Regions:
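A short, Lys/Arg-enriched amphipathic alpha-helix from helix-turn-helix/homeodomain DNA-binding modules
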Residues: 115-128, 143-146, 162-188, 193-196, ...
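A short, N-terminal "cap"/entry segment at the start of jelly-roll beta-barrel domains
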Residues: 1-7
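All-alpha amphipathic helical-bundle segments outside canonical DNA-binding/catalytic cores
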Residues: 108-117, 132-147
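Hydrophobic/aromatic-rich alpha-helical bundle segments in the mid-to-C-terminal region
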Residues: 49, 132-139, 160-165
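Amphipathic, well-ordered alpha-helical segments in soluble domains
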Residues: 32-35, 89, 118, 122-125, ...
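Aromatic/histidine-rich interaction motifs
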Residues: 98-124
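Basic/polar phosphate-binding segments, predominantly the helix-turn-helix DNA-binding elements
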Residues: 152-159, 186, 190-222, 242-270
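N-terminal regulatory/effector-sensing and dimerization cores
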Residues: 8-103
Length: 270
């Protein structure tokens, strides 16, 4: 089976891995409900780190950056089932069920969902779609599964209404604090802008005022400065740090490092 498999287009996904897998940059655009079938799922953001194992469920808030680590345990491998709770589907559910909320959600971004018979039965009902992924499943079936998941979540934790049905744009947050915490994520400038609650033009304008540099130039500068610190003071190997600092390849990192400091990272290490 291809990993991850799209069981119901845009809605239901299944992942299986037999060896550890780390994804440095995960831009979590939509709300997601994750069931851990086996193995350990670990997510680390700028502000928190948490894990879950077999049988646990996690509701993940949209518009986050994180590092994901997927670890097989024992002989079971790593397996997850993910329900993608896209905004258009949630808006449709809100209309059909006459769900209204005027409060902007301000709670935690990631919530462990306590298990119960209803949610356990729901996820068992999803298993056949995974086992028979070669059969085409219509979008209407996908919508029904999303709606069932949402209603069961609200039955379990009614206060999740604000989490699920807050469709407002992100607040305009402290840009300097956010960038200093997240510069190492290799994502487009447009996504940095969105995550700070700004248009691209507004992001560039505010960025210039705060850092007195354009975003791309600043990102290159701070990543290379941190790389030199790690190599010089921590004796880190270039191959061990370039991905964690947001560089796409070792060759790109080495070229940029030499251009700025006059030596390659390996020469600097010596």
């Amino acid at each position: 089976m291809i990993n991850p498999s799209e069981i119901i287009p845009g809605v239901l996904f299944y992942s299986y891995y037999s060896s550890l897998r780390k994804e440095k940059v995960a831009f979590l655009e939509h709300n997601m409900l994750v069931l851990q079938v086996s193995g350990r799922f670990t997510m680390e953001t700028a502000s928190e780190k948490f894990s879950m194992e077999r049988g646990e469920m996690l509701l993940i808030r949209r518009n986050q950056l994180g590092e994901l680590t997927k670890t097989p345990l024992n002989d079971e491998g790593y397996q997850t089932i993910v329900i993608c709770l896209k905004e258009d589907l949630l808006r449709q559910i809100a209309l059909e069920e006459q769900i209204e909320t005027e409060k902007k959600y301000t709670g935690p971004n990631n919530i462990i969902i306590p298990g119960n018979d209803f949610l356990d039965a729901f996820f068992k009902s999803v298993i056949p779609y995974v086992r028979h992924s070669e059969q085409n499943v219509t979008n209407s079936v996908g919508m029904l599964k999303v709606k069932e998941a949402v209603l069961l979540l609200l039955h379990t934790l009614p206060d999740l209404k604000d989490f699920l049905f807050d469709f407002s744009e992100p607040y305009k947050i402290d840009l300097e604090k956010f960038m200093l915490s997240n510069y190492h994520f290799n994502i487009p400038i447009e996504k940095f802008a969105r995550l700070t609650g700004r248009s691209l033009a507004g992001f560039k304008r505010d960025f210039q005022k705060i850092f007195n540099m354009a975003p791309r130039a600043w990102l290159q500068e701070i990543r290379l400065t941190e790389a030199r610190h790690l190599i010089e003071k921590k004796h880190k190997k270039p191959s061990a740090i370039y991905l964690d600092l947001g560089f796409e390849s070792l060759s790109h990192f080495s070229h940029s490092f030499k251009k700025k400091f006059g030596k390659t990272p390996s020469q600097w290490l010596v």
